[in-house]
Amino acid sequence: LRRYEAAKETALRQLDELYEKARKEAGEDSAAVFDVYAMILEGAQFDASIRSAIESQNVNAEYAVAVAGDDLAKMFEAMDDEYFRARSADIRDLSERLISILQGDSVKSAPGVGAVILAAKDLTPSETVQMDKSRLLGFITEFGSSNSHTAILARTMNVPALMGIPVDEHLEGRIAIID
C-alpha cells in the first residue's frame, strides 16, 4: 500500500508539471485534461478499488492499478456518448503512468533524428505534451478520434494530426506528408 501511495504522489507531481507545460504550449483549456487526471487519481472510486485489491486480495500495486484502470476504462467504453467513450483512453493513460512509476520506469523520448512525422498505434495526452515540438512536424495514429484529448491538444498546439489512419510499420524512415 505504501508503494501505491508513493506512486500516487509522484503521479500527482508529474501531472502538475504536465499541466504547466500544456498550459504554456496549448492554453488553460487544453491543459485542463491533466486536472481531470488528478481528479480521477484522487477520486474515491479509482483509489478505493486499488486500495481494496491491495488490502483484501493481497495483490501487488501494479496489478491492482491495472485491474482498477481496466474496469473504469471499460465502464467509459460502454457509454453511448462518443465523448465519454474517448475518456477511456485517458483512464488507460493514467493507469499506465502509475504502473510505470511503480516499476521505476522513466519517461522515454524519441532519439535525436531531426524533424519527424510520428506514426503510432496511439498517443496519450501525456505523450503529446512531452514531445519536442521543435522536431515534430505532425503525427498519425491508428487509434483515437477527433474527440480525444490528444486531438484537442494537437489542435491547440498547432501540430498537424490525423487519427484513425492505419499505420504501416514499414514506413519508418520514409518521406511522408500529412494532408
Regions found by a protein language model. Name each.
Residues 1-179:
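Non-catalytic, soluble scaffold/interaction modules
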